[in-house]
Amino acid sequence: MNTDDVLAVFREAGAILEGHFILTSGLRSPVFLQKARVFMHADKTEKLCKALAEKIRAADLGPIDYVVGPAIGGLIPSYETSRHLGVPSVWVERENGVFRLRRFDVPKGARVVIVEDIVTTGLSIRETIDCMKDLGIEVVAAACIVDRSAGKADVGTRLISLAAYEVPAYPADKLPPELAAIPAVKPGSRNI
């Protein structure tokens, strides 16, 4: 599965939106990938996550003990990808603004892959890595369905992406006039 195939799945689901969006990262963009419209379809989710699992397997990372998903966006793709890898899925969630592994016991030294939905700046993955390091858990790689930065985001580890789809993103004070003229909406989940 390549970038065009992934974007075709997003288009079929009506998940590529145009307008003025405030991304979870705080950046602004004329394009928003509404992955919830994809993930509401089990067949589309399975297709994408099975392909991502195959790409993770092909990366020859050695044994993987768990897949970790940052809540909220990483919950569905991490679970479905773990199913195809045949390993358990756990997640981190925010507690006072910091990712914590609250509901699971993962042993020190466990080898994990972090699976995210969409990467723009890599912040959620970096925060998940910090949480794992604090617990003595080894992050062998991160993976995502779509890398909006097309490889430019610093995620703090190797990033395996199913699709690289570079979409412009701007700080709020550096918007192009045509984007500034459109009212902004904030569909992301960072502060949930």
Swiss-Prot record:
It is an enzyme of class 2 (transferase). One of its GO terms (biological process) is pyrimidine nucleobase biosynthetic process. Signal peptide: none annotated. The keyword Transferase applies. Pathway: Pyrimidine metabolism; UMP biosynthesis via de novo pathway; UMP from orotate: step 1/2. Its cofactor is Mg(2+). 5-phospho-alpha-D-ribose 1-diphosphate binds at E116, D117, I118, V119, T120, T121, G122, L123, S124. Keywords: Glycosyltransferase, Magnesium, Pyrimidine biosynthesis, Transferase. Pfam families: Pribosyltran. GO terms for molecular function: magnesium ion binding; orotate phosphoribosyltransferase activity. It catalyses: orotidine 5'-phosphate + diphosphate = orotate + 5-phospho-alpha-D-ribose 1-diphosphate. Orotate binds at T120, R148. Its EC number is 2.4.2.10. Gene3D superfamilies: 3.40.50.2020. Belongs to the purine/pyrimidine phosphoribosyltransferase family. PyrE subfamily. PANTHER family: OROTATE PHOSPHORIBOSYLTRANSFERASE, URIDINE 5'-MONOPHOSPHATE SYNTHASE. NCBIfam families: pyrE_Therm. Catalyzes the transfer of a ribosyl phosphate group from 5-phosphoribose 1-diphosphate to orotate, leading to the formation of orotidine monophosphate (OMP). Homodimer. This is Orotate phosphoribosyltransferase. The lineage of its organism: Bacteria, Pseudomonadati, Pseudomonadota, Alphaproteobacteria, Hyphomicrobiales.
